[in-house]
Amino acid sequence: MSTEAAAVAQAGSVESANLAARNLQERLMASGHERPEGDRCPICFDLVELPVAAHSKMNVCCMKRVCIGCGLAAHQRGMFDSCPFCRTSLPHDNASTLAMIQKRVSKGDEAAINHLGDKYFHGMLGLAKNVSRAIELWTEAAELGSIGAHYSLSLVYYKGEGVEEDKPMGIHYCQQAAMKGHVLSRHNLGVVEYNNGNYELAVQHWMISAKMGYEPSLNTIKDMFKEGHAAKAQYAEALLGYRDAVEEMKSLQREEAKRLTN
């Protein structure tokens, strides 16, 4: 190949890469504006308040997160030893809990595989902490479509925790989760852009996550407004969207559950 032909080919490759990057950015900003169905309580069908883990309980029998409001309602009906959703008897120790998870893992349940990865990562349920095993499980769950697994992989690759640091790979997993409505992943993309000096793009990411009810994103936009990196109209829009999202997640049962636990 002549020098001229090689230069043309290289220019074409660069142009193709730039086009692919632009297309990805367009898809990234156009999708993931609504939280995934997995963030809804399977009983009342309302989105669970953020952070999800603090306002719901995972039931390993069916791998469904039930909001604290529906959990309270179940207790008020005398359901203390069975799952509010599938009515299976609840496990009472680590061994039986792990057995329930493993049973669903063996059937290829992406939520169970992701959940088991979490347990290995933190060394819970009597399991020895094993980050490598956690990453294996998260990778399998991500291939099956688990949004949570994409998020977890984004963190370990970006930080190099238990695996060789690979920030582009971490960002890739973060983008995949964000495009499916994962709030924390969307917020983290804003952090990445902020650290790269792309303040306008960072605010756009935080606008999306703030409108989904994520308070840290709203607070960050407020700080960006004070620093002159965000317009007053952007903060006002984010605040209105945040309030609407929070209001939609409220219910009398949930408020009662919070009152009883505080």
Language model: regions and residue ranges:
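Proximal pre-RING flanking segment of RING-type E3 ubiquitin ligases
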Residues: 2-54
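Short cysteine-rich clusters marking metal-coordination/redox-active sites
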Residues: 41-44, 58-59, 67, 83-86
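Cys/His-coordinated zinc-finger cores
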Residues: 61, 65-79
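Short helix-capping/linker turns of helical repeat alpha-solenoids
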Residues: 63, 106-113, 120-124, 138, ...
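Structural signature of tandem alpha-helical TPR/SEL1-like repeats
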Residues: 93-100, 127-137, 163-173, 196-205, ...
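TPR/TPR-like (Sel1-like) alpha-helical repeat modules
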Residues: 199-218, 222-251
